[in-house]
Amino acid sequence: MSKRKAPQETLNGGITDMLTELANFEKNVNQAIHKYNAYRKAASVIAKYPHKIKSGAEAKKLPGVGTKIAEKIDEFLATGKLRKLEKIRQDDTSSSINFLTRVSGIGPSAARKFVDEGIKTLEDLRKNEDKLNHHQRIGLKYFEDFEKRIPREEMLQMQDIVLSEVKKVDSEYIATVCGSFRRGAESSGDMDVLLTHPSFTSESAKQPKLLHRVVEQLQKVRFITDTLSKGETKFMGVCQLPSKNDEKEYPHRRIDIRLIPKDQYYCGVLYFTGSDIFNKNMRAHALEKGFTINEYTIRPLGVTGVAGEPLPVDSEKDIFDYIQWKYREPKDRSE
């Protein structure tokens, strides 16, 4: 998944950018995930609001916008800035940690460690490459590329390459590009591919070759350019669209490919399509109906609250049907 949300280009872009910056600060510096989620939810709701927000009171009528966030919106609308953010930006340690976490492979803990050692900028990282692991070096190498959003038009071209090459390896493979792209987003942060094969189930032995054969094919056609990590069920790497007729080079992009057992595939597709907030709402509804859902299975809950055996699932719609919830197309899941 992408490291950072791009600035919003909406009616209330200033407000959503402010909330996203606060969210990143809470996650990366304070490691306060509940506050991170609260700011993100508010930003997501406001991004879809069809009118220009004129006050915190107006924003507060929206789900997920509480009193404290409404007060921050009032301050931002009145002054064009937020004292809390100004303070964060002026604090060298906070701003440096926040910045370094934008490098793929550098999480909040690693960023804090680097800052404690006086490593605060890209230039500092380049001078201290011996202190970086393989993933972080690749993240540094392609930092500028990874910062760029991927336009939907490019994502569609990337999808065409992946799906066609997968079928060349074996026509029985099933692959789905998930994330915000599947929900119809105009741009994406990275490419998230789920992969399965009828011969691989949760009962069968591990079959890493099913994943590795696909990765090797995508390397052979020079779509995958770098490997960050390659396990038995997950590949993390870098890809690039081929340039046409000596046109300018396309940026390098992050790609993850996950191999999922066939019987767990559609629970995985549902989970990795998102959005996070939609998934939380769906899980809450499932619990009310006596089921528990995660990225692997849907299981009934007994009277004692203990989950039973996984239920058979052959499509996303099956999961909606079990919990008696009206099916929603991926484009309607961006909550």
Curated annotation (Swiss-Prot):
Any one cellular-component term (Gene Ontology): nucleus
Residue list for modification Omega-N-methylarginine: R83, R152
Residues binding K(+) 2: T101, V103, I106
UniProt keyword terms in alphabetical order: Acetylation, Cytoplasm, DNA damage, DNA repair, DNA replication, DNA synthesis, DNA-binding, DNA-directed DNA polymerase, Isopeptide bond, Lyase, Magnesium, Metal-binding, Methylation, Nucleotidyltransferase, Nucleus, Potassium, Sodium, Transferase, Ubl conjugation
Free-text description of this protein's post-translational modifications in UniProt: Methylation by PRMT6 stimulates the polymerase activity by enhancing DNA binding and processivity. Ubiquitinated at Lys-41, Lys-61 and Lys-81: monoubiquitinated by HUWE1/ARF-BP1. Monoubiquitinated protein is then the target of STUB1/CHIP, which catalyzes polyubiquitination from monoubiquitin, leading to degradation by the proteasome. USP47 mediates the deubiquitination of monoubiquitinated protein, preventing polyubiquitination by STUB1/CHIP and its subsequent degradation.
Subcellular location as annotated: Nucleus; Cytoplasm
Enzyme Commission designation: 2.7.7.7, 4.2.99.-, 4.2.99.18
BP GO terms, sorted: base-excision repair; DNA damage response; DNA-templated DNA replication; double-strand break repair via nonhomologous end joining
Listed GO MF terms: 5'-deoxyribose-5-phosphate lyase activity; class I DNA-(apurinic or apyrimidinic site) endonuclease activity; DNA binding; DNA-directed DNA polymerase activity; lyase activity; metal ion binding
Residues binding Na(+) 2, per UniProt: T101, V103, I106
Alphabetized PROSITE patterns for the sequence: DNA_POLYMERASE_X
Cross-link (Glycyl lysine isopeptide (Lys-Gly) (interchain with G-Cter in ubiquitin)), chain numbering: K41, K61, K81
Active site, per annotation: K72
Named cofactor requirement(s): Mg(2+)
PANTHER family recorded: DNA POLYMERASE BETA, DNA POLYMERASE TYPE-X FAMILY MEMBER
Name of the molecule in the record: DNA polymerase beta
